Amino acid sequence: MPGPISNRPITTPTIGAPNVPPRSFDVSQVTAQELAKLKQSSPSLAKTIEQAKTTYAAELKAGARITVTTTAANGGAPVLTLVPPGFDPKKPATVQTHYHGDVTSVAAPNGSHTGNIKEQFARDPQRVFVLPEAQGNVGGTGTNWNNVRDQAGTVTDALAGAGVSPVEGSKYVVSAHSAGGRALAAAMKPPGTLKADQLVLLDCLYESTNGPGANTAILNAVKAGGLKNVSDVVIVATGSYPADRDAAMKSAGGDKVRMEKLVPRQGLSNHEASARNHLVPKPR
C-alpha cells in the first residue's frame, strides 16, 4: 500500500515459540465455538481464520482447501495456505510464498494480492499460495516482520498442514510487495537458503528513514549468494523509489534479473497495481 512503507529498520528477527510444534486449522471446519475460544487464546490466529472464511467464501464453496498454520519458522504468527479448487496432487505444483505490504493482511478482503490470487485460482489450479503473516501492526503502517525466521521451513509446515506434498517438477516462487520487502530481507538470511526458483520484487526496494532498510539488506544478500537456488528475478517498480536501486539489483544478480513493465489498473495507485497485476509475472 502507498506511503512511507519501510520506515522500520531491519533488525534481528524475534524468535517466537521456538519449541511449539506446528498447528494447522482447516478454515472450513472451524466452528463458531472453536473460533470463540481461539479469540481468547490466539487473537491473531482467530482473526486470520475468521477473515479467510469471509474473504474466500466463494472459493471454499467451490472446493478450495484453505488452512491456517502456526509454526516457529514464522515466529508463531499465522500462515494462510490456499489450495485452489481442482488442484491435482499428482501433477507438479507451483508454490508461491507471498509477503504482503502495509495496511493489509494475509486474508484482507480488499488486499491487492487477494484480487490477484482469486484470479489465479481460475487460471491455474496448480498454483498454491503460502501467505505468512506479520507479528505486529498488521493492517496498519510499519508492519512488524521481525517474526520471519525460516521461509523454507514455513513452506514445509504450511504445505504439510494443508495436506500438500509437491511432486517432482514442482516449482517455488517467493514474492514481496511494498513493506513485505522487510520480510523478504529476513527470509534471505543466511544467504542461499531461500526456497525459490523465482523471486518477484513488487515495488519493495525501500530504505528506512533512519538508516539502511529492506533494499540494502536484500542487495547485500544477493551479493552474498542469496540467489543460489533462484533462476529468475522479476522487478516491478513504479518510480516511487530511485531507479538506481533496480540497476544495482540487476548488476548484483546478473542475467537472472529482469524488469517487468508496470501495467496500471483503473481505480488503484501504481503501487497497489504492482501487486494486483504482477503477483504472477509473465514467463521469461
Kindly label every feature range from the protein language model:
Residues M188-D197:
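Conserved hydrolase catalytic core segment
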Residues L199-T209, A237-S240:
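Active-site nucleophile loop of the alpha/beta-hydrolase fold
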Residues A176-A187:
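Glycine-rich nucleophile elbow surrounding the catalytic serine of serine-hydrolase chemistry
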Residues P13-V95:
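A domain-start/cap signature at the N-terminus of enzymes
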Residues V234-R284:
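C-terminal catalytic histidine-bearing segment of alpha/beta-hydrolase fold enzymes
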Residues P166-S178:
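Alpha/beta-hydrolase fold nucleophile elbow
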Residues D88-G161:
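Active-site machinery of serine-nucleophile hydrolases
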Residues E133, S175, L202-D203, V236:
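Alpha/beta-hydrolase-fold catalytic nucleophile elbow
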